[in-house]
Amino acid sequence: LIAIREQGFPRAVRLTRPDQYKEVFADARRVGDAGFTLLVRNNTGQGPRLGLAISKKCARRSVDRQRIKRNVRETFRVHRKDMASVDIVVMCRPAVTAWDNAQMQASLERFWARLSTSCENP
């Protein structure tokens, strides 16, 4: 039961307010590939937090936007215990809508692995 709580996705690990998003957009490192752009900013010790900015410009259909969000949240949830205290905003590119779930998850897992190794000594 304890392991389930540690791998949950509570409100504390999400960016929820516009001012939190503004801080990340104003001062962040960018990393990206063909499907995603991640904005990463060190935070003040609150642990890793995730924000999603999946626009209609990227994925026209609501079903596609929700599938992208679901994959991002799930991979973040599994990997967040290995990450340093960073705020992350994930944005997508139009190419990602043609990807299947396995391709999306593989791309995101590469980002999470890079973040866990590059953020150990910020």
Segment roles from a protein language model:
Residues 1-122:
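Positively charged, solvent-exposed patches that mediate nucleic-acid binding
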